[in-house]
Regions:
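N-terminal low-complexity, acidic/polar interaction/targeting segments
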Residues: 2-311, 318
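A short Gly-Trp-Pro
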Residues: 305-419
Length: 419
């Protein structure tokens, strides 16, 4: 089973764009290959330097394990996933104390989407942290990673530094499994070794010449009344290959082989990068069967590409196209970032947008994409703040311009079916 790892790469920040050398008028849209180092945004360097590595090995709990108590952090704007990198930044005294308590006592925390959805939350492990005092204000910055889905039985409080800290009581690790192919139920287990079908996923983007012909792969279908096209649709390798085919264009030159090859981890990863509303992601997170989750992900992707439209969430005017989505981070075309006000945004990056208005001068402070400066974007029809324009004048970086839209304010158009 191949697990994703979080790598910290050495970075020279001296090449960042300064105000004195920035000339917005000299910037033009750049098409073609992306040359930007897309590992930089995934490292969340804007959180600052001098992070301390959290001690401890990878957290792993058996299914149905009970955690008697664990600190809670509410984040109502974003649904988090196992395997996802999670940035946290706090300046308010209560939140700072909650994060310090989680760091010092547990090295883990429970991230809750909303009070109504405590039935399924995420256990996150602290990878590194920074506690500092800047201009008289205490800040706590954390880099964490999602580990397990968890069900919270109840929420109570405990006292830390004269502050009430929310605690999850009797949190139960939820089971994740992969349901069997329908044909597996009519095949003798002793025949598994001579029938293919368990490793036909085209992770590399090239055809697998070692797989058996489909007619042999579905040999047992001769003994059922189930049409072959239905069995083909339900086949796990076909399902994953269809999903990879829909998402491959988002990556440009970034190898998609970075995606996890364990089926359950892959289902978490591909669901996390979908540019859809939080309630739809929550419904996907509630699913225990990875096969079912992947089927629903594929259905959403097919509808997204059918309508091929990203609209303002307030007035529904056309803002962009699904075809224009690109990955400016090694984590994928979407990502979770936090601003100086501790507000979390899940964004999707595009190479072009329409019906937008820019405001302000480009700023480089707290930039989520090192070497880029940002400007505010608003819907030209209703004035709704929808995201940011990122620009660079460095000639060795492509693209010179791209756009990040917050999924709180825009939505990919799909039909009204809810998953």
């Amino acid at each position: 089973m191949l697990k994703r790892k979080c790598y910290i790469y050495p970075v020279k920040m001296s090449t960042d764009v300064t105000d004195s050398e920035f000339d917005e008028d000299a910037i033009s849209q750049t098409e073609g290959e992306i040359t930007y180092d897309r590992h930089l945004p995934a490292m969340h360097l804007y959180l600052g330097n001098n992070f301390i590595d959290a001690f401890g090995s990878r957290l792993f709990y058996e299914y149905d394990s009970i955690l008697r108590e664990i600190p809670i952090v509410f984040e109502e704007n974003v649904v988090f996933w196992p395997g996802q990198t999670i940035p946290l930044f706090a300046t308010s005294p209560d939140t700072c104390k909650a994060l310090k308590y989680a760091i010092r006592q547990f090295i883990e925390m429970c991230l809750v989407y909303s009070v109504e959805n405590i039935s399924c939350s995420i256990i996150a492990q602290v990878l590194s942290y920074r506690i500092a005092n800047e201009d008289g204000v205490e800040i706590v910055a954390v880099r964490a990673i999602g580990r397990h889905r968890v069900h919270i039985d109840s929420i109570e409080t405990t006292i830390f530094e004269n502050t009430d800290i929310l605690m999850a009581r009797d949190a139960k690790i939820l089971i994740d499994y992969v349901s069997r192919n329908p044909l597996d139920y009519i095949r003798l287990p002793s025949l598994d070794r001579i029938f293919p079908g368990k490793s036909d996923v085209d992770w590399s983007g090239t055809s697998n010449t070692n797989t058996f012909p489909m007619v042999e792969k579905f040999y047992e279908s001769k003994f059922t009344t189930i049409p072959k096209w239905i069995l083909n649709r339900l086949d796990l390798s076909v399902l994953i290959n269809n999903i990879l085919e829909h998402t491959r264009d988002w990556y440009n030159t970034l190898p998609i082989t970075n995606s996890p090859m364990d089926v359950t981890d892959f289902s978490f990863w591909v669901a996390s990068i979908l540019p859809i509303e939080a309630f739809r992601k929550m419904n996907l997170l509630l699913v225990s069967d990875a096969r079912t989750r992947l089927e629903r992900v594929l259905a959403i992707l097919e509808k997204m590409y059918h309508y091929n439209e990203i609209a303002c969430g307030l007035c529904e005017i056309d803002i962009g196209k699904v075809d224009d989505i690109i990955s400016m981070s090694s984590n994928g075309p979407t990502g979770v970032y936090v601003n100086t006000a501790s507000f979390m945004h899940e964004i999707v990056t595009l190479k072009s947008v329409r019906n937008i208005e820019e405001s302000g001068r480009p700023k480089g402070s707290f930039s989520w994409f090192p070497n880029y400066k940002w400007k505010l974007l608003a819907c030209s029809n209703c004035g709704n703040h929808i995201g940011w324009k990122f620009i660079t004048s460095l000639t060795n970086i492509s693209p010179s311009v791209f756009y990040a839209l917050t999924l709180l304010k825009v939505r990919c158009v799909i039909d009204s079916s809810s998953y």
